[in-house]
């Protein structure tokens, strides 16, 4: 039986599945609507698109490192609740995605969704299946691949913060210590030379406004601004920060003592930058009542 647009529309409305999934289901079941619905249910596709608009700000950070420690993949996979994020199935899903990124080098999220998992499903098919099974929206949000001519180390604070550091020189213990420091101190850049100029200009403008309010002479104000900017750069750069395990020395001194240097780092924290719409209880009750009436 030929699959028509109206049949696809009817199936989408009944299941909330995507257009292409509905078309495939109808083709597989020779246009039988009930069998197509069951096909989608078994595949976990029903309802996935309906849940796609819901905010997924919980989740995990997963990291995969190559055996030679020359390459690492770090990914953020989101869900809606911490309860689901702590589940073994969800963590295994995220871990396999990180392993796929490491193996394929695919860092574009849309392209990554089409990569195959060990069971033959694409990542997106597995994601939809899990949405149907668990009932929460899920998304692969961020993907990074880090490579090094030296060595790579990682550090994870639970599953909520993950760090990958590329280092030249030093040993495994040092690169892990630096990764742990990045997790705790959250530097914006490696050194002052790497800091975004727009960020610097914004901070300098703020410091100028603050200093001018002091009413001090111009030459004193200039020195105040220079001093505050030096302190600011120390606070936001990896090399300028005091090492978390030994605040008496900077990370720069720690690295120099081992003739080591950091060429790159990536720090991901679950949910950072995601805006969560806050709804009070009264609003939730009103919305639920309206839905029942509708």
Curated annotation (Swiss-Prot):
It is found in: Cytoplasm. One of its GO terms (molecular function) is translation elongation factor activity. Keywords: Cytoplasm, Elongation factor, Protein biosynthesis. GO terms for cellular component: cytoplasm. It holds the Pfam family EF_TS. Gene3D superfamilies: 1.10.286.20, DNA helicase RuvA subunit, C-terminal domain (1.10.8.10), Elongation factor Ts, dimerisation domain (3.30.479.20). InterPro entries: EF-Ts_dimer_sf, Transl_elong_EFTs/EF1B, Transl_elong_EFTs/EF1B_dimer, Transl_elong_Ts_CS, UBA-like_sf. The keyword Coiled coil does not apply. Residues 81-84 are annotated as: Involved in Mg(2+) ion dislocation from EF-Tu. Transmembrane segments: none annotated. It comes from the Bacteria. Associates with the EF-Tu.GDP complex and induces the exchange of GDP to GTP. It remains bound to the aminoacyl-tRNA.EF-Tu.GTP complex up to the GTP hydrolysis stage on the ribosome. Belongs to the EF-Ts family. This is Elongation factor Ts. It comes from Hydrogenovibrio crunogenus (strain DSM 25203 / XCL-2). The gene is tsf.
């Amino acid at each position: 039986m030929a699959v028509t647009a109206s049949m696809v529309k009817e199936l989408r409305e009944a299941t909330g599945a995507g257009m292409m999934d509905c078309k495939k289901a109808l083709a597989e079941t020779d246009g039988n609507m009930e069998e197509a619905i069951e096909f989608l249910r078994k595949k976990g596709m029903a309802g996935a698109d309906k849940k796609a608009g819901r905010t997924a700000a919980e989740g995990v950070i997963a990291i995969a490192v190559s055996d030679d420690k020359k390459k690492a993949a770090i990914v953020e996979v989101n869900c809606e609740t911490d309860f689901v994020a702590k589940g073994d199935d969800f963590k295994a899903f995220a871990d396999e995605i990180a392993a796929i990124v490491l193996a394929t080098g695919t860092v574009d999220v849309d392209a990554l969704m089409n990569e195959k998992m060990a069971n033959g499903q694409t990542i997106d098919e597995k994601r939809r299946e899990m949405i149907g099974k668990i009932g929460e929206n899920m998304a692969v949000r961020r993907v990074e691949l880090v490579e090094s001519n030296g060595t790579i180390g990682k550090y994870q604070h639970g599953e909520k913060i993950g760090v990958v550091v590329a280092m030249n020189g030093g040993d495994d213990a040092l690169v892990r210590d630096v990764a742990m420091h990045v997790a705790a101190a959250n530097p914006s850049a490696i050194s002052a030379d790497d800091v975004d100029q727009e960020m610097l200009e914004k901070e300098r403008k703020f410091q100028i406004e603050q200093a001018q309010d002091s009413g001090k002479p111009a030459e004193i104000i200039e020195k105040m601004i220079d001093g505050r900017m030096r302190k600011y750069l120390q606070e936001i750069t990896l090399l300028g920060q005091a090492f978390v395990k030994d605040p008496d020395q900077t990370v720069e001194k720690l690295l120099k003592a081992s003739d080591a240097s950091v060429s790159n780092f990536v720090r991901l924290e679950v949910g950072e930058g995601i805006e969560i719409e806050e709804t009070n209880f009264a609003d939730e009750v009103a919305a639920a009542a309206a839905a029942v009436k509708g």
